[in-house]
From Swiss-Prot:
Entry annotated with the keyword Nucleus: yes
Gene name of the record: hapX
Family the UniProt entry places it in: Belongs to the bZIP family. YAP subfamily.
Domain bZIP: 67-108
Positions of the UniProt region annotated as Basic motif: 72-91
Induction (free text): Expression is highly up-regulated during iron starvation.
Protein name: bZIP transcription factor hapX
Region (Disordered): 1-82, 201-242, 282-317, 429-449
Coiled-coil stretches: none
Length: 474
């Protein structure tokens, strides 16, 4: 085992120092320093040239790998693990196939649902378009319906106007009101209202009468109470003048003085009472053809101020000052409320009937001449009244139609229409000339007048009554 140090071959040959039991371990070899200068030969020293291989240090905590022969248990474990890995790989493959199938089914269902949704959306769009069309159609039908309604209303209004115009032009005894007791000449409601008002006034005036009543007045009132006034319709008062006119036409060649006088019923004279129109016509038959009407000789209405105080601010006399009665003949030949104005205006008809009823009730209450002992004349002061009437100026009068027109111009006439029984008696009509002689009638200009006229002074008094009565109302 000894080698010489001087031989170069022995210097480069490695020397293994590892034990024989560990052939796999690396040996630590130490190479000689060839480049180093060789030292001077020292005597009695030996230098080894063997290469030593040092094994690597094992890592801490781990056993060193040992090549042990495989045993039966390990072989079984390895086989089991191998089989497990194979089964697991097969299971994974199966699951992947199932997943693919599920995904395909899901895609098919999703495609079907998308197709259904698309169809539903198309149907919704169609339904929306149909709904819009129906809305437009409904709107068009509603417009047509409104047009038809308007046309129907216009036709109904036009028919009503035609019916109303036919009613106004009809001169028959059609009932204007709704009480079924009124005709075109008389209104039972108005007569009853004035009779009740007169009875109440008589009861209140009896205890405070200033003078006693004459026996003739008492007998007259008792007679009127015991025998109620019988009101007949205009048809019962009609008279056939056909033969009279024919006789008058044949006798006109003879003496005019023997010509019979034919009169139309005035409508204000009642059955059993003297008629002012008939008396005036009998007294002066010749004045009717030779002399003009006395109404044209009356002073204008502007001169009312010299008989009555000046009107108040609410009076509307200035508007009606130029109204002069143009009806020189009797416009209400068939009775009160039968003239053209009364037929055209129901308020005028009610006013005319109320005035006629008030005049009739006043005539029943008063004395023999209807004045009641006042300024209109009575039995006791007939002589003095007849003497003074010749010297006095004839009063200014208005026709019934002009009176209504004058009063209706007052701003409070609508409110006053509900209180006719309070102010209608204040309108003074012409005195009842049943007991007047022909000279007095001629002096008082009572010939050739309409059947009913109202004093202008009393009209002014009623206008002032409206101002006082409705001063606070707005």
């Amino acid at each position: 085992m000894s080698t010489s140090a001087g031989t170069p071959t022995s210097a480069h040959a490695p020397l293994s120092i590892a034990p024989a039991s560990t052939p796999h371990q690396r040996s630590l070899s130490v190479k000689p320093l060839a480049a180093a200068p060789s030292p001077a030969p020292v005597t009695q020293c030996s230098i080894t040239s063997k290469e030593w291989i040092v094994p690597p240090r094992p890592k801490p905590g781990r056993k060193p790998a040992t090549d042990t022969p495989p045993t039966k248990r390990k072989a079984q474990n390895r086989a089991a693990q191998r089989a497990f890995r194979e089964r697991r790989a097969a299971r994974v493959g199966e699951l992947e196939e199932q997943i693919k199938k599920i995904e395909e089914e899901n895609e098919r269902e999703e495609a079907a649902l998308k197709k259904t949704i698309q169809q539903q959306q198309q149907q919704i769009e169609e339904y929306k378009s149909q709904l819009l069309w129906w809305k437009n159609r409904c709107k068009a039908v509603e417009d047509e319906l409104m047009t038809e309604k308007v046309a129907k209303e216009d036709a109904i209004k036009q028919l009503e106007r035609i019916n109303n115009s036919g009613r106004t032009t009809n001169n028959g005894n059609s009932v204007i009101g709704g009480c079924e007791r009124c005709s075109s000449t008389r209104c039972q409601c108005i007569d009853d209202a004035f009779n009740i008002a007169n009875i109440t006034q008589m009861q209140t005036d009896d205890p405070h009468s200033k003078r006693g009543r004459s026996p003739s007045q008492g007998a007259t009132q008792k007679r009127h109470r015991s025998n109620p006034e019988i009101k007949t319709e205009p048809e019962d008062l009609e008279t056939d003048f056909t033969h009279s006119f024919s006789l008058r036409r044949h006798s006109r060649t003879g003496n005019d003085a023997t010509t019979p006088i034919l009169l139309d019923p005035c409508g204000f004279c009642q059955d059993g009472s003297p008629c002012i129109c008939a008396e005036m016509a009998e007294d002066q038959p010749s004045d009717r053809s030779n002399q003009p009407s006395q109404l044209t000789k009356l002073p204008p209405i502007q001169n009312i101020s010299q008989f009555t105080p000046p009107p108040s601010e609410g009076d509307v006399l200035s508007k009606s000052a130029t109204l002069v009665s143009s009806n020189k003949s009797n416009p209400c030949a068939n009775g009160p409320g039968t003239c053209a104005q009364c037929l055209a205006d129901p308020r005028s008809s009610v006013f005319c009937k109320s005035l006629a009823a008030s005049r009739a009730s006043t005539r029943q209450e008063g004395g023999c001449c209807g004045g009641g002992g006042g300024k209109d004349g009575c039995c006791k002061n007939r002589s003095s009244g007849s003497d003074s009437s010749k010297q006095a100026t004839s009063p200014i009068t208005l026709s019934c139609a002009d009176t209504f027109t004058t009063l209706s111009l007052h701003p409070k006439f609508a409110s006053a229409s509900n209180e006719l029984s309070n102010w209608i008696p204040q309108l003074h009509t012409l005195p009842n000339p049943q007991n007047l002689n022909p000279d007095r009638r001629r002096d008082q200009n009572l010939t050739n007048r309409p059947a009913l006229e109202v004093e202008a002074a009393s009209v002014m008094g009623v206008l002032r009554y409206f101002d006082r009565r409705f001063a606070d109302s707005k």
